[in-house]
C-alpha cells in the first residue's frame, strides 16, 4: 500500500513588519523598533518570520549588529554569562 503524500495548503503571505510599523529607514539608534526583530533569546528573526524583503532584512540585521556594538542591544546568550558570574 502506497503512503499518501501530505499536501499542504497555500501558504499565507507574511505581513511586512516594517511597513506595518510605518518605518521608512532602519536606524541602529531606534532600539524599540529593532527589538521587534529580535527573539526572546536575543537572536535576529528570519525573513520567514518577519516578512521583510531581502534588502530590508539586510538593513535590519546590520542595524542590530551596530546597536549591539554600541551596547544598545544585548548579544545572544549574554544572560547566561551574567548568571554564571553571579552564582559562584
Swiss-Prot record:
GO terms for cellular component: cytosolic small ribosomal subunit; peptidoglycan-based cell wall; plasma membrane. Pfam families: Ribosomal_S18 (PF01084). GO terms for molecular function: small ribosomal subunit rRNA binding; structural constituent of ribosome. Keywords: Ribonucleoprotein, Ribosomal protein, RNA-binding, rRNA-binding. The keyword DNA repair does not apply. One of its GO terms (biological process) is translation. The keyword Ribosomal protein applies. InterPro entries: Ribosomal_bS18, Ribosomal_bS18_CS, Ribosomal_bS18_sf. Belongs to the bacterial ribosomal protein bS18 family. Binds as a heterodimer with protein bS6 to the central domain of the 16S rRNA, where it helps stabilize the platform of the 30S subunit. Part of the 30S ribosomal subunit. Forms a tight heterodimer with protein bS6. This is Small ribosomal subunit protein bS18B. It comes from Mycobacterium tuberculosis (strain ATCC 25618 / H37Rv). The lineage of its organism: Bacteria, Bacillati, Actinomycetota, Actinomycetes, Mycobacteriales.
